[in-house]
A protein has these predicted regions:
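Hydrophobic residues at beta-strand termini and immediately following loops
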Residues: 1, 84, 128
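PLP-dependent aminotransferase class I/II
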Residues: 1-77
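Short acidic/glycine-enriched loop/turn segments that link adjacent beta-strands
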Residues: 12, 88-89, 120-124
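Short hydrophobic/aromatic beta-strand micro-patches
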Residues: 19, 93-95, 129-131
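Short secondary-structure capping/turn micro-motifs that flank functional sites
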Residues: 44, 66, 91, 122-123
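Conserved PLP-binding catalytic core of the aspartate aminotransferase-like
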Residues: 64-65, 75-109
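Residue-level detector of anion-binding/catalytic polar loops
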Residues: 112
Length: 147
């Protein structure tokens, strides 16, 4: 089971792919309603599965993974950051010495981050998305401004 949502820019379509043994897939297919996926969503998935589109998506995913690792290392080196959790997604969980000031600095730069401070054991934690290079630069700038 694999999502097409985030990595393939189809978040609104709510699509995924399921691969498996034909016998298992047959059992699952029997449980599906007659038209389980809207036609526009199917068209988007079919367009995505074209070789050229898959190649572009793979390049973008690789670039995002590289930016994520670089961003994690950069943030972890800043004095205002206590911890950056390992991530397999397109976001990072970052524990800050002053999360409120970091959030304000991000807002001033047109960036939204999610405050996780109210969650148990996550005091001072923000979830930051790995954006495009310009967004990533503004994010680092916001963290550095608070440090």
């Amino acid at each position: 089971l694999r999502t097409l949502s985030k990595g393939y820019a189809l978040a609104g379509a709510r699509l995924g792919v399921l691969c498996g043994a034909p016998e298992l897939l047959g059992l699952l297919r029997a449980l599906l309603p007659p038209y389980p996926v809207p036609t526009p969503s199917l068209a988007a998935a079919e367009a995505l599965l074209e070789p050229a589109a898959l190649a572009r998506a793979r390049l973008e995913i690789a670039a995002t993974l590289t930016r994520r690792e670089t961003l994690a290392e950069t943030l972890d080196s800043l004095p205002g950051v206590r911890r950056v959790w390992p991530s397999e997604a397109n976001f990072l969980l970052v524990q800050c010495r002053n999360a409120e000031r970091v959030m304000e600095a991000c807002r001033e730069r047109g960036l939204l981050v999610r405050d996780f401070s109210r969650q148990p054991a996550l005091e001072g934690c923000l979830r930051v998305t790995v954006g495009d290079p310009a967004e990533t630069e503004r994010l680092v700038d916001a963290f550095e401004a608070v440090a």
